């Protein structure tokens, strides 16, 4: 275990699998105490299970790190507040927030339902706000904090992903504004634009296309 983040507390949303899991494990490896948030749903957001978050917490503890699971949805203000509250109640502070939770409801725009649009916007764009707002209350008081948001190259436009692209590009504007709002309080806010093969992005259709391309 490293010690670069010793004494720091981090929240990672959508940390049960994929990029979020890797982020949570790395933070713990560097000495941070981690709140592992994951609703445990399918890639489209349906269903829920505690096992993904629990498994990551176990991995961290098996490596002699400290972590706690949280199963709230980022799509509601109450869920976001409770995720941040979990860090305070368990570890007494918050230093790092990584907004990573996401779902997909891919469909060509002419076939996309309002419900499919709303579901993706709620988890990605609202989810970033719902966790960032209560975190910033704490960060402003302590005059320090780090926020890392998760955008995507799909924000520049991707076939069949009008909802996802809109949310991910919205996160870029949100990030820039939060950085300006919070910079005077010693808080940074940045976004990453990953291109990654994860459970969320490697759909059966994409997997079939990759196989055909071999």
What positions do the PLM features span?
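A short, exposed helix-loop element centered on a Lys and neighboring polar residues
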Residues: 132-133, 176
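The beta1-alpha1 cofactor-binding region of Rossmann-like NAD(H)/NADP(H)-dependent oxidoreductases
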Residues: 54, 71-85, 114
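A glycine-rich helix->loop->beta "capping" turn
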Residues: 6, 63-66, 79, 86-99, ...
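Catalytic loop of short-chain dehydrogenase/reductase
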Residues: 146-170, 175-176, 180-184, 193-213
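Canonical Rossmann dinucleotide-binding motif of NAD(H)/NADP(H)-dependent dehydrogenases/reductases
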Residues: 3-35
């Amino acid at each position: 275990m490293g010690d670069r983040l010793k004494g720091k507390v981090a929240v990672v949303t959508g940390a049960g699998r994929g990029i979020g899991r890797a982020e949570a494990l790395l933070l713990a490896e560097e000495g941070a105490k981690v709140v592992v948030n994951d609703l445990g749903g399918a890639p489209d957001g349906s269903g829920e299970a505690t096992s993904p978050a629990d498994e990551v917490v176990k991995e961290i503890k098996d490596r002699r790190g400290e972590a706690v699971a949280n199963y709230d949805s980022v799509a509601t203000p109450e869920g976001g507040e409770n995720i941040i509250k979990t860090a305070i109640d368990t570890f007494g502070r918050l230093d790092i927030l990584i907004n990573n939770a996401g779902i997909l409801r891919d469909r060509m725009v002419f076939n996309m339902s309002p419900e499919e649009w709303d579901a993706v916007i709620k988890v990605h764009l609202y989810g970033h706000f719902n966790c960032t707002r209560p975190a910033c209350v704490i960060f402003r008081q302590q005059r320090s904090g780090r926020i890392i948001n998760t955008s995507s190259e799909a924000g520049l436009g991707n076939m069949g992903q009008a909802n996802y692209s809109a949310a991910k590009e919205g996160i870029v504007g949100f990030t820039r504004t939060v950085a300006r709002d919070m910079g005077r309080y010693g808080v940074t806010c940045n976004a990453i634009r990953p291109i990654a093969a994860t459970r969320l992005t490697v759909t059966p259709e994409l997997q079939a296309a990759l196989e055909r391309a071999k």
